[in-house]
UniProtKB/Swiss-Prot annotation:
This is Probable transcriptional regulatory protein BH14810. Pfam families: TACO1_YebC_N, Transcrip_reg. It comes from Bartonella henselae (strain ATCC 49882 / DSM 28221 / CCUG 30454 / Houston 1). One of its GO terms (cellular component) is cytosol. Keywords: Cytoplasm, DNA-binding, Transcription, Transcription regulation. SUPFAM superfamilies: YebC-like (SSF75625). Belongs to the TACO1 family. PANTHER family: TRANSCRIPTIONAL REGULATORY PROTEIN YEBC-RELATED, TRANSLATIONAL ACTIVATOR OF CYTOCHROME C OXIDASE 1.
Amino acid sequence: MAGHSQFKNIMHRKGRQDAMRSKIFSKLAREITVAAKQGSPDPAMNPRLRLAVQNAKAQSMPKDNIERAIKKASGSDVENYDEVRYEGYGPGGVAVIVEALTDNRNRTASNIRAAFTKSGGALGETGSVSFMFNRIGEIIYKPEAGTTDNIMDAAIEAGAEDVQSEETGHHIICTFEDIGEVSKMLEAKLGEAESIKTVWKATTLTPVDEEKALSILRLISTLEEDDDVQNVYANFDVSDEILAKLSA
């Protein structure tokens, strides 16, 4: 089982749902504000903002929160956020990419470096691991959104590149550049998605045992708890047997 979305599900079952939701909304609001500040405050005229709003809606973020985040961009006291990508190796040689929006690069770099070091890994230079990933668009629908055939037909018509239907939902893959248009066309056919985002998909996987999997889980959790961190991606591969143990 590749990636760490399954581990996110495990973490959410540990009784931290409310705290996680609050943090997710905070990160979504930051992305909306940055997108609105960089372009038009009208989602119809700003592709990045439109995608950010779509994703916020997919995460059930209240409409008032979304509008407040957009309005914040026009304020004179709004912080200036830099988009920064950090790369390094975690436990077991697992490649990790961290995306952040920060108003203090020194603080964020220090926190992320400390997290890597504590886990037994090491923060590297930009480009040190990203060659093992592809930048893609990923749109996720719940299982009840439609049959496999219906989802496939809608995805093909929208210009998607691949569809992976599982018990947990339908994962629709498209190019990084086309995610805005593809998600818009899918919404017209299938309704609002559960998740719309650009992701780093691993092309090279690193198998890990149970001990290393737990260490990676702790590293990812620590990174995602940082307010500046927007997304974390890792290229580990864990067996279904180990995943079942961690889910127990």
